[in-house]
Amino acid sequence: MKVRASVKKICRNCKIIRRKNIIRVICSNDPKHKQRQG
C-alpha cells in the first residue's frame, strides 16, 4: 500500500474507489498498485 498525495491509475486494471472520504486505488492484476491518498 502506497500513501500518496495524488493517486493515479497505473495500469488499466486499476480502479479508483472512495471509502469514507479516503480515495483508494485497487488493482486486481498487480497488488503493488494499491494506493491511498493521505
UniProtKB/Swiss-Prot annotation:
Task: List cellular component terms (GO).
Answer: cytoplasm; ribonucleoprotein complex; ribosome
Q: Name one GO molecular function term.
A: structural constituent of ribosome
UniProt keyword list:
Ribonucleoprotein, Ribosomal protein
The reply on keyword DNA damage is no
What InterPro entries does this protein's entry cite?
Ribosomal_bL36, Ribosomal_bL36_sp
List GO BP terms, alphabetically: translation
Q: Which family does it belong to?
A: Belongs to the bacterial ribosomal protein bL36 family.
| Name of the protein this chain belongs to | Large ribosomal subunit protein bL36
User: What organism does the UniProt record list as the source?
Assistant: Buchnera aphidicola subsp. Cinara cedri (strain Cc)
Name of the gene this protein is made from: rpmJ
